[in-house]
Amino acid sequence: MNDPISDMLTRIRNSQMRGKSTVETPASKARARVLDVLADEGYIRGYEAKTGKDGHPAFEISLKYYEGTPVIRELKRVSKPGRRVYMSVGDIPQVRQGLGVSIVSTSKGVMSDANARSQNVGGEVLCTIF
């Protein structure tokens, strides 16, 4: 697997389209940081570390729905292994006029676009969520 973040986002997107309540993904520090931002912004209920079916560490992600429809309507990977996207603090895009969130990997850690602006740091734009 070349892009673990993209794999996790695809698992979340596919599970929500199928109406699943939870989804399992292999564990890593980078995935945990992205999941922390998703939980803080209210796009997932939370996640917990456990041992996967194959015996390796995994995260069980609890997906969030509002009146039967998924809270996450759109989930896009921006920076990819073949084309990294770095932006200064002034260039970080607002998703849907501020209704969505960009997840940015900065020198101060992985955070939402609003936190990056408030701390005046830019970085690699990992994905956008609406």
Swiss-Prot record:
Assigned keywords, A-Z: Ribonucleoprotein, Ribosomal protein, RNA-binding, rRNA-binding
Key word Mitochondrion present: no
GO biological process: translation
InterPro entries in the record: Ribosomal_uS8 (IPR000630), Ribosomal_uS8_CS (IPR047863), Ribosomal_uS8_sf (IPR035987)
Annotated signal peptide: none
Entry GO MF terms: rRNA binding; structural constituent of ribosome
Family label: Belongs to the universal ribosomal protein uS8 family.
Protein name as annotated: Small ribosomal subunit protein uS8
Phylogenetic classification of the source organism: Bacteria, Pseudomonadati, Pseudomonadota, Alphaproteobacteria, Rhodobacterales
